[in-house]
């Protein structure tokens, strides 16, 4: 399943209606239990009867995440899952994803410009610049290999090196 801040949810439905629609598309038998579980985990209980179009971007993000997880996928594709979120909500989403990944044993494919997020959520990384892979490895390997403090510094070093070659 896929989540992106660039894909909008149906605006005129309530949160519960949105999740129910997606649950029915996946033919989930225990849809109410699944909605209850995800709304509790993602702090959506108080929003279930709210109109989706009236939610904040952080609330919509959590609804989109619940939608993507409604059918308990084995693989979750995330495109900038915390883009435009305030630090507190972004941290909550990252913590949720870490816990959910371990609990449900799912794989997450993540596209992100947030290197702290990548470090926190990813075991294996492909760093790309202009659509070209510039390095790969796990966060610790990449940091040690390039003698930097963090992945952002690694990326900047590699990116500048690539620019000098062009």
Where do the language-model regions lie?
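Conserved ABC ATPase "signature" region
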Residues: 1, 20, 24-47
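Catalytic Walker B motif of ABC-type/P-loop ATPase nucleotide-binding domains
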Residues: 76-79
